[in-house]
Amino acid sequence: MSLAVEAVKDFLLKLQDDICEALEAEDGQATFVEDKWTREGGGGGRTRVMVDGAVIEKGGVNFSHVYGKGLPMSSTERHPDIAGCNFEAMGVSLVIHPKNPHVPTSHANVRLFVAEREGKEPVWWFGGGFDLTPYYAVEEDCRDFHQVAQDLCKPFGADVYARFKGWCDEYFFIPYRNEARGIGGLFFDDLNEWPFEKCFEFVQAVGKGYMDAYIPIVNRRKNTPYTEQQVEFQEFRRGRYAEFNLVIDRGTKFGLQSGGRTESILISLPPRARWGYNWQPEPGTPEARLTEYFLTKRQWV
């Protein structure tokens, strides 16, 4: 079986370009700085970073394409049959941390993984999704975000949105805090239940859907006035974001264990965060409502 790996790579490179262009237009001040890198074991990538923009305080949009021999533990613990195989992994991953606490943080990722087995068909799967982490959440934004997610899933099956929305709720959860990281979206991994071409079509829809879901929210909220107290709450919630990425996220573990580029992997961390001992928001405030209402498993559409 011949996989259209080059077509996937071309799509990912263009997706990185398109997302950076859309975010630069929304910021209106800062631009992404590109840092090309190579991986000693094979492959490389393009890291693009925006800092101190008018809207985006820190944003990273990464493309990577790495290959080599011998898979890291984070892959083989779920796929022991491919331990020691040659592998190829490529993807676009991004996290956007806006300056204004009324603009949510967003994350998106689309990727392809291929493992070559001698004398056998290659093992392949796609993964990815997108999700939203608001600080001062607005119901309209949450509904619209999930509506885009639901609409892009419909052509691929009646149950696809519900499955991948549920998976997102489960994955982006901090068990030791008993808190969700955000209001969810879509998450999928090990996607090979359809033919390669159909899986690739779905991944393309997810990549483009991220922009349709997120950019309008940025546009609506970026000029909302905010206070220093609200920035402090944003930084407190960013602490939770950092915890998830460092302690739980499989992508971070895979990148670090496979000898990936540390600066690119940790670009998802916020520029500033805070931790307070046993800090709790005042009852009845928007800060309390975030965890009590928005960060619970809800059917938004």
UniProtKB/Swiss-Prot annotation:
Keywords, alphabetical: Cytoplasm, Heme biosynthesis, Oxidoreductase, Porphyrin biosynthesis
Binding sites annotated in the UniProt record for substrate: S93, N109, V110, R111, G259, G260, R261
Main location as per UniProt: cytoplasm
Pfam families (alphabetical): Coprogen_oxidas (PF01218)
SUPFAM superfamilies per UniProt: Coproporphyrinogen III oxidase
Cellular component annotations (GO), alphabetically ordered: cytoplasm
InterPro entries linked to this entry: Coprogen_oxidase_aer (IPR001260), Coprogen_oxidase_aer_sf (IPR036406), Coprogen_oxidase_CS (IPR018375)
Subcellular localization: Cytoplasm
EC number(s) given by UniProt: 1.3.3.3
Domain of life: Eukaryota
Ranges for region Important for dimerization: 49-58, 241-276
List of catalytic residues: H107 (proton donor)
Subunit structure: Homodimer.
Protein name as catalogued: Oxygen-dependent coproporphyrinogen-III oxidase
Organism lineage: Eukaryota, Discoba, Euglenozoa, Kinetoplastea, Metakinetoplastina
